[in-house]
UniProtKB/Swiss-Prot annotation:
The keyword Nucleotide-binding applies. This is Flagellar brake protein YcgR. Keywords: Bacterial flagellum, c-di-GMP, Nucleotide-binding. InterPro entries: PilZ_domain, Split_barrel_FMN-bd, T3SS_YcgR, T3SS_YcgR_PilZN. The lineage of its organism: Bacteria, Pseudomonadati, Pseudomonadota, Betaproteobacteria, Rhodocyclales. It comes from Azoarcus sp. (strain BH72). GO terms for biological process: bacterial-type flagellum-dependent cell motility; regulation of bacterial-type flagellum-dependent cell motility by regulation of motor speed.
């Protein structure tokens, strides 16, 4: 386990229809938790109350079928705060799908001679597959942007330039400032301008589906907005698919070059 103060923290803010993504069956939940173990997936956990963020992993699902064990760390101060928490909000990714669940009353224990926390298996788990299309993380070296027109109270329109951090045939995720920007679930923005490297700018209409709060290692907070394309023209869809294919082809070529 490591302190998350110097890493990126992700807090789920809102989604359009959580019920669609909530799992309640203990077998399904345990399968996903086992997947986190098998993939050695890092988990961002946050204490409630207290908002102490740290990185951890699921290390075991005991045979009792009712408990989960997560990794603790060498910092006794953090471990004490975690052990005194009412619950932990845990967030991770598995197969590029965001996973979130709560652990109630984590209790300090030991597992394989290491400090750990034991808690009841969560009664529900959020498996947030925001879009049913393959999502591509955009290269940092070739920025994809989207200019979003924001109506102002005085009747003017402010065009906000956002950085696209992932893209698919179904939508995009963009980073927006956390304050003074009217972004909320189900809001729609027309006449947005999506700019793809080497392919130019295409007009799109976006609908906000969910929001996450991001905190980078420098303490700067931003919002990650997952947006769905609305009535995407075929020509725009073709351009997006060409872009995704090109980026994947280039990545594969680089990987082959390292072998």
């Amino acid at each position: 386990m490591s302190n998350q103060n110097d890493d990126t923290r992700v807090d789920l803010l809102g989604s359009d229809d959580f019920e669609k993504y909530l799992l309640y069956g203990s077998r399904e939940i345990r399968q996903i938790l086992q997947g986190l173990i098998d993939h050695h997936a890092l988990i961002t956990a946050q204490t409630v109350p207290g908002h102490q963020s740290f990185l951890t992993t699921v290390v075991a699902l005991p045979d009792d079928g009712a408990s989960i064990i997560i990794d603790a760390g060498p910092d006794e101060h953090i471990n004490q705060r975690v052990g005194n928490a009412e619950r932990l909000v845990c967030m991770s990714q598995l197969d590029k799908i965001r996973i979130q669940f709560d652990l109630s009353a984590p209790a300090l224990t030991r597992y394989e001679n290491r400090p750990a926390f034991r808690a009841p298996v969560p009664a529900q788990l959020l498996r947030l597959q925001r879009r049913e299309f393959y999502r591509l993380q955009t290269p940092v070296t070739h920025t994809v942007t989207c200019r979003i027109p924001l109506p102002q109270p005085d009747g003017r329109t402010l065009e906000l330039e956002t950085r696209v951090i992932d893209i698919s045939g179904g939508g995009i995720a963009v980073v927006v400032p956390p304050d003074n920007v009217p972004f909320g679930a189900d809001m729609e923005f027309e006449n947005c301008k999506l700019t793809l490297p080497e392919l130019g700018t295409i007009p799109v209409r976006l609908k906000v589906r969910n929001l996450f709060r991001l905190t980078n290692r420098n303490g700067v907070e931003m919002l990650r907005a997952g947006c769905e394309f609305v009535d995407l023209p075929r020509s725009a869809d073709n351009a997006i698919q060409r872009y995704i294919f090109k980026v994947e082809r280039d990545r594969s070529a680089r990987e082959r070059g390292r072998l």
